[in-house]
């Protein structure tokens, strides 16, 4: 096994165990608002600390970028670990059992390893660039649909930037003319993994951060899917908007999404 993948899996499982254990102890969860509609808990921080400790033991010089602590610069900035210690914090706080740990390893700007762990279902999604994607020991391939007919799409709402909600509804109104239904699960990392696993046929969202999608992005691509931003480009880790699906489905999604974009995103 790729040695960095091994460490990423170990870190994700350790963090997942902390999250799952505390999910059952609701009175011990301390929630703080770090921005409008944006929450962090003591469990996010405990999960993050566990991940950082495991990475630093094996790779003390690597840079670590996390949702809660920002960038922890190492002497080797070519290797960056991009971490969301609890993707789906709102679900966790509300007692909805759908959240994950997301860890990506980027080397010289290219994602080489992706790990997403769902501690409630004990599902471990992994990918190594050029080696495919897996769910536990099962190889993943995207559902190779030819068009949007009958498709189920995952999405998220721009709850931190409400001015883009009309755009979101325009996109959904356009897509629903072809697709069967939508799902809004509250974990971008798992939405991407579900595209890779064929559980949903595509995913689109505005308002994501790099740590939300860096691991899931590689998992989709290694499962044979395509990931772009709303302009069909590859700047989604910085742009904050993302589309993922099998090739033909993605093309049709973009054809529906692009005419609906807000003026400042065109």
Segments (PLM) and residue ranges:
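Short, Asp-centered acidic motifs that coordinate Mg2+ and/or phosphate
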Residues: 63, 113, 152, 201-202
């Amino acid at each position: 096994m790729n040695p960095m993948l091994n460490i990423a899996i170990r870190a994700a499982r350790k963090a997942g165990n902390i999250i799952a254990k505390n999910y059952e102890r609701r009175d011990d969860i301390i929630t703080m608002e770090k921005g409008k509609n944006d929450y962090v808990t003591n469990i996010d921080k405990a999960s993050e600390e566990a991940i950082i400790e495991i990475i630093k033991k094996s790779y003390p010089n690597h840079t670590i970028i996390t949702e809660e602590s920002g960038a922890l610069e190492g002497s080797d900035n070519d290797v960056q670990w991009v971490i969301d210690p609890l993707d789906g914090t709102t679900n966790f706080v509300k007692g909805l059992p759908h959240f994950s740990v997301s860890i990506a390893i980027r080397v010289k700007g290219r994602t080489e390893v992706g790990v997403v762990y769902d501690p409630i279902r004990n599902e471990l999604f992994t990918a190594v660039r050029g080696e495919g994607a897996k769910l536990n020991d099962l190889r993943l391939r995207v559902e190779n649909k030819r068009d949007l007919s009958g498709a189920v799409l995952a999405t998220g709402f721009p709850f931190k930037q409400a001015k883009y909600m009309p755009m979101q509804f325009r996109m959904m109104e356009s897509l629903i003319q072809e697709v069967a239904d939508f799902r809004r699960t509250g974990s971008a990392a798992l939405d991407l993994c579900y595209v890779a696993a064929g559980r949903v046929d595509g995913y689109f969202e505005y308002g994501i951060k790099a740590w939300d999608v860096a691991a899931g992005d590689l998992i989709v691509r290694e499962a044979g899917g395509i990931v772009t931003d709303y302009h069909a480009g590859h700047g989604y880790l910085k742009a904050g908007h993302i589309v993922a699906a099998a090739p033909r489905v993605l093309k049709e999604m973009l054809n529906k999404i692009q005419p609906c974009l807000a003026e400042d995103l065109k």
